[in-house]
Structures are given as structure tokens and as C-alpha cells.
Amino acid sequence: MIQIKRALISVSDKSGLVEFAKFLNQNGVEIISTGGTLKLLKDNGIAAIAIDDYTGFPEILDGRVKTLHPKVHGGLLGVISNPAHKQKMEELKIPKIDLVVVNLYPFLKTVSKPEVQLEEAIENIDIGGPSMIRSAAKNYKHTLVLTDPNDYKEIQNLISSSGISEEISASYMRKAFSHTAMYDAAISSWFYKQSGEVFPDVLNLSFIKKQKLRYGENPHQAASFYEPLFTKSDFSPLQGKELSFNNMLDFDAAFHISSLLPENTVCIIKHLNPCGIAYADNPLEAFQLARRTDPISAFGGVIGIKGQVNGELATSITENFVEGVIAQKFTQEALEVFSKKPNIRLIEIQDFKEALDELDLRPIHHGLLIQDRDYTTITEKDLKVVTKKQPSPDDIRGLMFAWSCVRFIKSNAIVYTEENATLGIGAGQMSRVDSVQLGANKALNVGLSVVGSYVASDAFFPFRDGIDTLAKAGAKAIIQPGGSVRDEEVIQAADEHGLIMVFTGMRHFRH
């Protein structure tokens, strides 16, 4: 058991500290402290020794050097059960420090400010704090280290009852090393970001556990949700069951797709694939257009809405079973409608804007693949008309909408659209011509005609068979990257069928 007789306290986050320090004083614990922490303690009538009085060495360099002293680190690292350590500490008059209460300069909070300057960031890099934390954590069998104000109450209870066991101290040791690792990762990441280096030679990733999930993709898989250091989720849950692993993936997909498309866009997601996308003058009309694409697959889906959900739209949504809705805003009337279906998960995120600097991370065996997210867009000026038949301005708008949809569909991806709504989606087929046929069949199965439709392909057509198939279905125009060794054959097929075809020069594979 660790007997707490002496504590060193030096914190930036002072929440809960006064009550905790008073408790330590009342239990006969001698407190050593520094700077602003010392002032707070004394202002509240708590006995404490200044660090420079303790070490006999003044704080120097504007407070940059306060605790980097053998009397501090000897007291933290000394193993009292080791006779040689004990003898040397007595010889040098180094008392044992049993408890360290330290949290670090607010580097992350500082660099999160848009106007932060380099010098301010540098001055918020803590040196002495991490050193004390690491020393105490290394010697956890004899020294307790606290880095989180939320832990003060538990330690008070333990000191008052069963005491501090080695096992308990070990749990705080793990938390302490995670704290310093996270701190260093934040510093490293920020400086790399300032340099413009997207893919550094050494990648430090720090994530904070936000919540434990009920299970993973399947009930036999454990799962949790973690947030990266520099990003705080602004998803606001309004009602519904706890989010599952699969729910979170689908909500994220619905947000990504909706955020990159025009106002009043609605997309319906099932297993990470869109089964309907549309935009209109209002979200209700867009929802109706998106749902008609594949109403069977929309059953049990997640709906993303770049706009406001009112009572009328909520009523339309609840006519069928859905897992959840993510939108910019829900009116009070909408919430009253949804309250009658309390299991429907509602997420509000007012800033429906994609973070365009996010990276795409994918673990593989013994490694991690990282790439830029596929956010690059094209304009009408990037289109190259390759057929004899030329597109009208309306055709260009329809083709651009189709192109904006196909990038979100699993490869091989084909989508048939009107000017503002999907008609049929062919997703995830190993053969492109099969995706062409699937998309047409999906539309026909729900009574939608693809005659006069716009067709987007996420990658080039390797053979003319895809063109022949979509022409037979009645498509009017095609947008695709081009770049096949058989482009001439594909263009010839389009000309034979009197189709419009444009090349984008950009592929949108989605593995």
C-alpha cells in the first residue's frame, strides 16, 4: 500500500483542486506546489510549500524551469524498499514524494484558436509536467500519479477507506503514460501540420475513447468509438436507441454525402451505400424523390438531410421503418412526430460542412494505409465531349449531378439519374457491365423509366458492352473518366447509339 505523506501539486486545470487539497491537508499530507497553483492554494487557506523553498533553487527563465531538480525527481523515483536508494536519499536529504498531481499546459486548447501564433504555442509546451508524470508513473509501486481532476474524488474515498494499493496505482500509471503520449502526439501533429506535411515519416495518432458501443458489426464483436485529439464531434443526439457500430458508419456516410451536395439534398444509406439521392426546392420533395429510387432497400436505412426537418417531412419519414435521421435542424413539430417512434435515432449537426482536410485511414495486415479523402471535384469546364452528339445545358446539369452521386457508390459503380434525382443504382459488382444492367433493373423493378436518363460510371468502360447495355435501356448521356485502351471502341459505340458521352479525366473508385 502507498502511504500518502507528501504530495507535489502543479496543475493547469484547477477544477476540483481546492477541495482535494483541503482533504489532503486535513489528512496530514504535506503539499509542495508551484506558481499559480501555489497561489490558489494559499488564497484558499491551504498550507503549501513553494517549490523553490523546497529545492533551494529559484524558478528561472520566466518559469520555464521550476521542477527539473534532483530533489524533485529523486523524491519521485526513489524506491524506498531499495536500501541503496534509501541511503542515498537520506544522505542527500531528499524526502520521498508519494503523490504527484499534475496536468499539463493547455497546448491543445491553445493551438485550437484560429489566430494562435507560433510563440504562444511554444510557450504552452510543458516540460516539467511531463517529466514529473513520467517519473511518478515509472515508480508507480511507490508513487501515485493523478492527471485528471475527475479522479480526485475516488482517491479521497480510497485514502479514507481501503488505501492505495499497487493495483490501483498501476491503473493511474497507465492513464498517466497515455496522458503524456497524447500530449506529445498533439505537439508533433500540430507542428507537422504547420509545415504542410500531410504524410510525416513518423505518424503519431491519439484518440480519446468517447463511448463503448453495444457491439461491433456483429453481436460477437466488441467495439468502441474514439475521437481524434483535434476534432470534437458536433453530432447532437436528440432521441432514439444507443448508436451501434453499424449505425455510426451509416450516419457518417449520410453526413459525408449530404454535406458535399447542394442545399435540400436527401440521401438514404443502407450498408454504407446510397440507395437514393436527390435534391429539390425543399427537403420533403427531395426525400420523396430519393426514396422512390429503391423503397425496398430504404427500409431500415439511415437518412441524411442537408436542411431542416419539419413536421410534414417527419410524418412522411415515419410512414416506413428507418434506423435514424441526421439533419441540420429538426423543428419542434418534427420532434413531436418522431417522439411517437422513440426508437428512431435522431442526430442534429448544424454545421453541415465537410472537413476537407480529413484523411482516410485503413488498417491492413501489419500496417496502415492512409490517403487523402476523395473530395476533389470537377466543374463543367473540366468536361470533354467525345461524341458527335453534343450536350445541352440541361444535359450538363444532369450529368454533373450523376457524377456527384457515383463517387459515393461502391465500385464498380453505375448510377442512372434525372437532373436532380437518382433512378437506379448499380453498386459493388465485379463486372462493370453487370453494374450497368443492375442499375437499369433496379429502376425498372420499382416502375421507374431510365429512358432519357443520365448515366455516370466511377471508372472507365473497359469494353463497349456497357455502352450497348445502357443504350438498350434507353439512357441519353454518359459521364465517365475515360482512359481505357479501348476508349475509341467505346466512343464508337456511343456514336452508333446516338448517345452523348463526356470524359472527366478523374476516377472515383470506392473499394
Swiss-Prot record:
This enzyme catalyses: (6R)-10-formyltetrahydrofolate + 5-amino-1-(5-phospho-beta-D-ribosyl)imidazole-4-carboxamide = 5-formamido-1-(5-phospho-D-ribosyl)imidazole-4-carboxamide + (6S)-5,6,7,8-tetrahydrofolate; IMP + H2O = 5-formamido-1-(5-phospho-D-ribosyl)imidazole-4-carboxamide
Q: Which CDD domains match?
A: IMPCH
From the record, give the transmembrane residue ranges. none
* Enzyme Commission number(s): 2.1.2.3, 3.5.4.10
Tell me which SMART domains the record gives.
Answer: AICARFT_IMPCHas, MGS
Pfam families per record: AICARFT_IMPCHas (PF01808), MGS (PF02142)
* The keyword Nucleotide-binding belongs to this UniProt entry's keyword annotation: no
Spell out the InterPro entries in the cross-references.
Answer: AICAR_Tfase_dup_dom_sf (IPR024051), Cytidine_deaminase-like (IPR016193), MGS-like_dom (IPR011607), MGS-like_dom_sf (IPR036914), PurH-like (IPR002695)
> Which residues are in the MGS-like domain?
1-147
BP-aspect Gene Ontology terms:
'de novo' IMP biosynthetic process
Molecular function GO labels:
IMP cyclohydrolase activity; phosphoribosylaminoimidazolecarboxamide formyltransferase activity
Keyword check for Hydrolase = yes
Sorted keywords for this record are: Hydrolase, Multifunctional enzyme, Purine biosynthesis, Transferase
| Pathway recorded for this protein | Purine metabolism; IMP biosynthesis via de novo pathway; 5-formamido-1-(5-phospho-D-ribosyl)imidazole-4-carboxamide from 5-amino-1-(5-phospho-D-ribosyl)imidazole-4-carboxamide (10-formyl THF route): step 1/1; Purine metabolism; IMP biosynthesis via de novo pathway; IMP from 5-formamido-1-(5-phospho-D-ribosyl)imidazole-4-carboxamide: step 1/1
Q: What GO cellular component term, any one, is given?
A: cytosol
Q: Which PANTHER family match?
A: BIFUNCTIONAL PURINE BIOSYNTHESIS PROTEIN ATIC, BIFUNCTIONAL PURINE BIOSYNTHESIS PROTEIN PURH
Family listed: Belongs to the PurH family.
Q: Domain text from the record?
A: The IMP cyclohydrolase activity resides in the N-terminal region.
Q: What is this protein called?
A: Bifunctional purine biosynthesis protein PurH
Q: Which organism is it from?
A: Leptospira interrogans serogroup Icterohaemorrhagiae serovar copenhageni (strain Fiocruz L1-130)
Question: What gene name does this entry carry?
Answer: purH
